[in-house]
A protein has these predicted regions:
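Extended, polar beta-sheet/loop recognition surfaces of beta-rich domains
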Residues: 21-27, 47, 121-168
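Boundary-flanking segments of nucleic-acid-binding domains in nuclear regulatory proteins
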Residues: 65-67, 95, 135
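N-terminal export/targeting and maturation segments
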Residues: 20-78
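Signal that preferentially marks extracellular ectodomain short beta-strand elements
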Residues: 79-113, 121-124
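Generic recognition of long tandem-repeat/solenoid scaffolds
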Residues: 39-43, 82-86, 90, 150
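Sec-dependent bacterial lipoprotein signal peptides
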Residues: 1-20
Length: 168
């Protein structure tokens, strides 16, 4: 199996592994901000000396499951991959240099539910080795009087659920 195929398989397994679990159990929470009307995804992992971005998948959540709306993978460092620092964000729909766009971006529609899964490889002083980490965030696009804006959906620990009502 090629390095690229291994990379994709690892990403798919990590995302599938966390699809129905709480954000703090098997995945860490990703951040979402807004840039030019689109979501911009970030990870905050202060223990990592280096974060290597492997890929990002964004899905629409429906009653029937999930539908991919954007997917990008990045080459591993030995193949010239770019490094992601905790302060940067990945803007939805951008074609990044050296990245492979597996699924071109679909328009994000107000009132629909979305989830983002970001896979990174991190090096930390504690482990002295590379490990894979999955970051997850749920969001929606909400229309107000003047425009459409991004809303990150919080995880409610006591209720063991996502607070999707903020998107209504």
């Amino acid at each position: 199996m090629s390095k690229f195929a291994n990379h994709i398989a690892c990403f798919v397994l990590a995302c599938a592994h966390t699809a129905c679990t709480a954000v703090d159990h098997r995945a860490q929470e990703a951040g979402i901000s807004q840039m030019d009307g689109q979501p911009c995804f970030s990870v905050n992992f202060p223990k990592a000396s280096v974060l290597e971005l492997a890929g990002i998948e964004v899905h629409e959540r429906t009653e029937r499951g999930v539908r991919p709306v954007w997917e990008v993978t990045f080459p591993i460092a030995q193949d010239g991959g770019e490094y992601l620092r905790s302060v940067q964000c990945l803007r939805y729909g951008i074609q990044y240099p050296k990245a492979s766009e597996i699924k071109q971006p679909s328009p994000l529609v107000p009132g629909r539910r979305y989830e983002a899964d970001i896979l990174v490889y991190a090096w930390t002083a504690e482990t002295h080795e590379q490990r894979a980490y999955n970051f997850k965030a749920n969001f929606c696009m909400k229309r107000n009087e003047n425009d459409v804006h991004v809303v990150q959906v919080p995880w409610i620990e006591k209720g063991n659920r996502w607070e999707w009502s903020i998107c209504d």
